[in-house]
A protein has these predicted regions:
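Conserved NAD+-utilizing ADP-ribose enzyme module
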Residues: 1-123
């Protein structure tokens, strides 16, 4: 992806980036998170723990934390394995966060419903 495309997407509103995320992960069947040798990166405050996700490696790299690397998650594993664990642990998702903000915060069920709705268009 070229720098001008990255810049255009980064400059979208959080809601527009969320729509972009849903379309891309549904189409490419891949989600990106940040991981180190001890596990997934989490963010948030005392009130809510958030699991940050991006649609493409380039965007995860923009928000890369020390010692964390972008890590690809196949969409099936994301929906069938990771999301149920996050839901059980009361973790919500920060979709497409940037250095200037947390992105759109969604529950596991909201993410699943939006991805399923988008995937129906590809069938």
């Amino acid at each position: 992806m070229n720098n001008s495309r990255i810049k255009n997407i980064v400059n979208l509103s959080a809601a527009e980036r969320y729509g972009y995320f849903i379309r891309k992960v549904s189409d490419f069947e891949e989600v990106w998170g940040l991981k180190d040798k001890e596990g997934w990166a989490l963010m948030g405050n005392n009130e809510q723990v958030l699991f940050p996700v991006w649609s493409e490696k380039e965007f995860a790299e923009l928000c890369k934390w020390d010692n964390y690397q972008p890590y690809s998650i196949p969409l099936d594993d994301f929906i069938e394995k990771l999301l149920p664990k996050l839901e059980k642990d009361n973790v919500m998702l920060a979709v497409f966060p940037l250095s200037k903000g947390k992105g759109i915060i969604r529950t596991v069920q909201e993410i699943i419903a939006d991805i399923e709705r988008e995937c129906e268009q590809y069938e």
